[in-house]
Each structure stands twice: as structure tokens, then as C-alpha cells.
Amino acid sequence: MKKYLALLAIILVSILSFKWTFLADDKNHRLEILLLGHNSQHHNSEKFAEIVSQAFFKDGINISYTTDPNDLNDENLAKYDGLMIYANHDTISPSQEKALLNYVKSGKGFIPVHCASFCFQNSPEYINMVGGQFKEHKTGTFSATIVDSKHPIMKGVNAFSTWDETYVHQKIAKDIHVLTERVEGDHHEPYTWVKNYGKGKVFYTAYGHDQRSWTNPDFLKMLENGVVWSVNDAARKDWNKLPKPEPGYSDAKLPNYEKRPEGFKLQAPLSAEQSQLLSQIPVDFKLELFASEPDITKPIAMAWDERGRLWIVETVDYPNTVRDVKGEGQDRIKICEDTNGDGKADKFTVFADKFNIPTSITFANGGVIIAQAPDFIFLKDTDGDDKADIREKLITGWGTFDTHAGPSSLKYGMDNKIWGTVGYSGFNGKVAEQQLKFGQGVYSFSPSGKQMEFLGGTSNNTWGIGFSENNDVFISTANNTHSAFLGIPYPYLKQIGKPVSQSVEKIDGHYAMHVVTKNLRQVDVHNGFTAAAGHNLYTARNFPKKYWNRIAFVNEPTGRVVHEAIIEPKGSGFRERDGWNFMASADEWFGPVQTEVGPDGAVWVLDWYNFIIQHNPTPEGFENGKGNAYINPLRDRTHGRIYKVVYKNATAQKIKSLNKKDPKSLISGLESDNMFWRTTAQRLIVESGDKQIVPALYKLIQDKKVDELGINAPAIHALWTLQGLGVLEGTNAEAFSVAAAALNHPSAGVRKAALMVLPDNSASLAAILKAGLMNDQDLNTRLAAVLKISKLPVSPTLVSELQSAEKLAENKDDKWLSTAFTIALKRHMPISVDVAAKDTKTASGSTKEPASEKVAKVITISPIVNAMKYDMKTFTVKAGTTVEVVFKNIDFMQHNLLILQKGSMDKVGAAADKLAQDPKGAALQYVPKMPEVLFHTSLVNPEGSETLKFKVPASPGNYPYICSFPGHWRIMNGVMKVIP
């Protein structure tokens, strides 16, 4: 009772301490500033953007970051109140120059900072607008001399001292008004100035080479004042009227994984309206609240039915109220409806209750499947009252010892199976008569629950899966792999003895997330993704084209952000680029856990809303509960929000609902530009088993048109619908003919779907070869073709063609294609191809001893489960002897073991931190290449082991050992004591 009274007190304090009045005037908006940076570590504009964004955010200023000068166009610039430049772009195109100059002349703000005075050197007018150009510099620590202390920009700014580059300018305009100078002897160098340009205002400062200036409070104050001064009067007037929430803070017992000297305070929760005022979304979008407490509580998963109604999974039992009797839980499945069309839910129906920590929901067979470890449960309403009448177990065997590592992200796939992910709690059970056991990764199963496959293993806890419109599969994992690609499912790799971990490739191209709050609390992968969840692409057409089938939404609740992961083709696979944020909040309770395209084409965000996000490892001074999460009475059990992010210029979706008894309605669903409706229509047709709709499916498949992306999505879904109806099993000649003809479709995605749905027979092999898909110009479709060939009847005559194709550079040098050809050759020439996997590892960096060398000692080290510590803090060995160190990873995430030179732990640790932010860091096992690293294992997966055999250094002393996985080394370390 005391803990709930404490929470109530916190909430009351938050209400009383708020200096806030809600103004429902849309004109009162946050200032929107576009920051143009560049891709360079010198003058690191990305880091500059993060610092400035965090400093200005709670004052109502949004920073949108780009490195692309092509964003200097009339349409894009018009969205912003001001443009800040911190970059070294040598040249500017005529169209970009015209757009930039006209933008400022029209009355918008311009804020060039530091190196911006040496940007666009081919534009004299740009230099004139800035007010001067960089000429040369030295470096040093110097003080700002304030020239005009009465100017609004200098209000509250003290004369500050900082280390920076000592800029000297040339081509200084006559109309600048100097605010600060850098004085060196008799020389007074203008260092901060303002000027007018047309109707616009320009603020320039030469300060800002690196963090020594960026983090100076007076520099930041001057820069923020400069931003506010530079925007036009209308924008500033609206901004001045903007409510700026000031949440209350109180002392509380909170984990301090980062070991910050100042620790943390507990922010009081905000109302949904207040929280929105501390949120940032793209400038041409609006944030709408669909539902919040008390109508909903702790939503953890969502899905929509064929009527476009939102269903959510609520769990107040999560994470530690694990009940022995699962039918006695407090968790519910709830339907949320907007009955009057105002965009907000006004009807809430409990479909089923008494669940205990359900974690996902999807629709199948006229009902829903709920993930509630250890079971998958099928629920169905049989009398139309929106209450579950049928409740039966579908699959049993999901691990229960850790509630944030169980099954999640259930989705109906194009192949008419249910897909999902699971964390390290894994699965161990019987499906039909097949005994299955697997750990973290991705799986699929039939909607009936009678068949299941493990498709790919991941490196750590996993809570996210998504499909592209061309049926590519992407995954997010919690720790340092927020974007991954399922390249070749494990059943294929198994044929050549490859491990399940090689099915999935880490493709994320960056480490950092970009937060707008300074109060970041993470256990590891600091400032990176340590709790990533979800990986849903934008698969509708209501948003601008740059989003279509290209930008995936990855949630990071510890960072309070929804990340934009830009997915681009790379050979037969993909790579991810940093798209910054789709949504970010300075409300320290905002906890996005699922972000997905809804029936209306908007993006819906499920906000778990909780100050405490971290599950484990157990912080000092705390204990774990039954769900393996550390016990903290501050874990919230009452809040929850659902938002919609709507594009302001979007057109309304034509489809509002589908009628499963109306074939015309279902065909319209397949023709929708929203993948939700296409998938829902496909599911309903397959579930109906109505083959009378087949001719209409043929018509969709035979349509040769493609959209702006080269996709014909209706044809793709129509092909998979045929497969789901069972007409492509080899006995329906017309269906086979239509699908085979689609092998020549202009859309690569249609060709891929066609070859995948064809039956596994000789006729399909002949059709695929005739269409030339083994040499398809689209490498992703080519990959699917080669994998399909590996399943088809053995054809010795195909061997020479496979061998010739395998040698082509685009196949040989492609990770996935080279493996696929090996699999296909193994199938068609099984005796002469030796591709058995050799998974025994020799630890690189170790001193390899002859087999006859006597091992003086064997040391076995393991991590302590969930503690991020080794179970052996020290061990002792004799100098010059040969020893073996066996590292057994019994934890649930990757770890390694590095033995270092004496006194080098901090140096190597710092190098490991830097390597963690390198896109190639994972490929290097996060092991810095430096002489201080004496011996090391690779990254060892859960349940794996690796042995180091080496000769102990001759010099006695203390040799540290660490785990160099991002963020671990400060906690996970020990000492090898070498004695004479």
C-alpha cells in the first residue's frame, strides 16, 4: 500500500507543480529549425545537432537534422521557421542557392554557425548574406568580449571563456552589427554578429568547433537567443504563447547504471495533452491522441480487425506478477473504437480478460491469437457480441522465466503463416508430433498451430519483425542491432551444415540514437539502442514518397524515441541508414513499444508510458522478481496512450472496412495502396476457402502495371492468396499457367512472389529456368530463385549452369547469393560438394601452441546470468606457462573475453566504446586492433563457448580482462594475476 500512496503523491505533486495552461490554438506551435550538417567527424554536425536539440527542446524549439543540400528547396524550406547551417559543403547548385536566398529574403531566420562561414564558396551572395567568410585560424582558449550587451540576443549571456578555433574572417559585410569580439592584442576580430537580409534576419557566431564550446551554458544561451531573434515576428509571437510544460521532479531510489555523480530524479507523469507538448514529429505532420488512461492501461501490443477497429493487449501484471494459475491474471484484450469519426476512441469493449502477461496479438481463423507464455491462445467470438466465447490453447512451450524475453510481434505473413519473434526465454515444446527447441530469433507457424518452423537466430533479446511490400523480412533486437535482415531461413542453411545464427544479418549502419532529453538511463549500449522494439516499414501511400516501403519505425523506449531506419538495397540483401527520428519526446515517461501503419494510412504509436523501462540486469541495491525484472515500486500500472501521426496533406483512405462475405469488397482490399488492407483481404479470402474468387485473382496477377517504386502489390498478394487457397499445388493447370506467366512480370516483387508460390515440381523448375530468374537483374529476386531451385527435383543437367552462375562476380561477392548457390549445388550435386560447416573456433589474437605443448592450467569463466559480470573476478597463473581459458556463455546475450596488457583497461575500454559506434564494429567482434589486447575470443552467442590457449606473459603483474560488447567493460571485468 505504501508504494501506491507514494505514486499517488508523485502524481499530485506533478499536477500542483505544473506551470501550464492548455491553449487549443493550432497557431501556437514550437519553433521549427532545420539544421543542415554534413557527413564528417571534423566539425561533427551530428553531435552538435544532438547537443543543441537537447538544450533547446524543453523551451519549445525543434531541431530537424539533415546532411543533404538538396533539402534546400522551396517546398521543404517553407516548412521551417529558420535554417541553421553547421557544415562544410564546398559548393551550392543554382537551384539550391536561389531557394536559400529567397527563403531568407522572405522573412525567415538564418543561423550560420562556425564553419558555415566557409560553406558554399562558389556563391558570393551566400557569403554576403552570412556577413563574412572564414579565412584562417589557430586554436586556443579565449574570452568573449561582449560589444552590445543590450541586444536581445545577449540577454542572460555572460562573457564566457572557451577553447575554440580562433577564426579570422575576410569579405566582411559593411552592414553587420557586432555582438561579440575576439580580442588578441590590438586586433578586434568580429566573432558574433547579426544583420538583415531582405525581410529576414541573420545571426552568425564563429564559436563552435567542438563540445568544449557546444556545452558551454553561455554559448548555448546565446545561440538559443539567436534562433529566437532570427525568426519572424509571427513565429516568435506564436512561440511565446506556446505552453511549455515544466514537470515536477522528486528524489527516488533509481538505478544509476551509468554511475553519474549527480544521479537521477524521478519526473512526475504528465497528462497526455502535456506530454504531446514535449514531443517532436516531422514538420508537415500532426500528432493526434486516439486513447489514453483511464480508458486504456499499459498497452503492450496492438492490431486491427477487418472493420478497422483497434484491438490492444493490456498488461498490468507485467513484468513481475507471474501467476502460477494463468486464468487469474489482471490483463485484458480490449477493442477500442471511434464510433463518431472524430479521430478519438469513444467505445471500449473488453473482449477477454484474466490474462497474465500477454505480449502480442494477431488475427486468424475468425478470431485472434494471443501470445501468453507458455501458451499461444486462440480466442473467438461466436455470437457477435465482441466477447470471446472460445478460448483454447494452440501451442505450448514458450519459456516463462523472463517476461521481456518471451514471444512477441505476431503478424500474418504473406505466406499465410503467422510470424513472430522470441527472446532468450525461447521455446521447448511439441507442435503436433514434432519436438522443437530453439532460442531467440524468428519463427513461423500455421494458423491452426499444427506446424511451426524456426527460421533464424538472433544475437540477443528480440522483440520486433516487419515485412516489406516485396516480402522481405526485417528484425530488430534489443541490444545494438536495431535493424537486421533475414537473408536465408535456417531450413536452407541446415542443408549445408551452417548454424542458425547465419540466417540473420545485422544491417544497421549506425550506433547512436538521437534523443531530446539529457536524462538518458540505460544499462548498456549507452546512447545507442539497448531496448529496440518493432521494425515496421511504412507500407501505405498517405505519407510523402520518401517513406514508401523504405522507412521502418523502430521504437527505443529508453531513449523516448521512434527511430526512422532507412532501408536500402545492398546486393541481394539490404542495409540501414540513419534517418534520425520519427517521434521523440522529452517526457521521461514516454515509452513507445509498437509503431505501425494503421488502416487509415497514418502511423499509430503505442505508448506504454512508464518512467521505469529497464528490465535487467539487477542494479545494485535491488532484487529481481518472478519475471526476472528488478523490483521497483515505481513501475507504473495505470497509464497508457495511443497516438496517431498524420500527414497534413494526406488523402483519406477509400476503404473503411472489409466484408468477408462480399468478394467485391475483398478484391478492393487486395487493390488497396495500404498493405494492411491487402493483407487483411488476403487472410479473409484464404480463411473462407472460396475458390469462386480465383478468376478475379488471375486478373490482378495479369495486370502488368507498376507504381512509382516499380511495385505491383495487388499482384503479389493475389499470388499468395492463390497459394493459400490451395490451387497452386500442381493440379490446377490454369492457376499454374497464370503464376508461371508472372515470372516475366515487370515488377521484381511479383516475379519473386510467383516463383515462391509455384509447386515444388519439375514443371516449376522448367518455368523458372525459362524465365531466366537465376540471372534476374534484381538480385533479391535472384536470391529467391536460387533458393527455390534448391528445393526442386534433382536435375544433374542443371549443375553446370549453377556452377557458371556461381562464378559471376555479382553472385560470388554477394553474401547471400554465394551461400544460396552452395545450397542449390548441394541439392543437385550432393556427393561432390563438401560444404559441411566447421564451427570450431580458434580464438584470433591468441598464441597458438603446438599440440604437444603441455597445458599447465585450465580456467573456466562464465558470465553471471543477467548481472553483466564474470563469475570469476580473478584467477592466478604462472608466468611463461601455457594455459587454456574456456569461456562459456551461459547468459542470454553475446559476450566476449579480452585479456589485456597491464594497466590498459581504460585505454582499451575507450577504444571499445569508439568501435561500438563504428558500423563495422560488430564484424570486428568489438575487439579493438591494438597491441594492448593480448588474447581474445570472438563474440560468443548464448549457450556457446570458446577456448583461448596461450602462453602466459613472462612479466608478473595484474592483467585485466574485459567484455568489450558495447557498454559492458566498465562492469564486466576481472584480473588475471601472473606470478613468477
Where in this protein do the model-derived segments appear?
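Extracellular/periplasmic metallocenter environments
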Residues: 931-980
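Catalytic beta-strand/loop cores that center a nucleophilic Ser/Cys/Thr
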Residues: 132-206
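Extracellular ligand-binding/catalytic regions of CAZymes and related secreted enzymes
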Residues: 27-31, 58, 197-262
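N-terminal edge beta-strand
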Residues: 853-882
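Extracellular/periplasmic ectodomains of large secreted or surface enzymes and adhesion receptors
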Residues: 244-289, 496-516, 523, 580, ...
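Beta-propeller domains with acidic blade repeats across secreted/periplasmic ectodomains
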Residues: 32, 55, 62, 66, ...
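Beta-strand cores of secreted/periplasmic/IMS beta-sandwich domains, seen most often
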Residues: 309, 466, 874-899, 946-960, ...
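A glycine-rich, often tryptophan-bearing local segment used as a flexible ligand/cofactor-contacting loop or short
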Residues: 36, 90-156
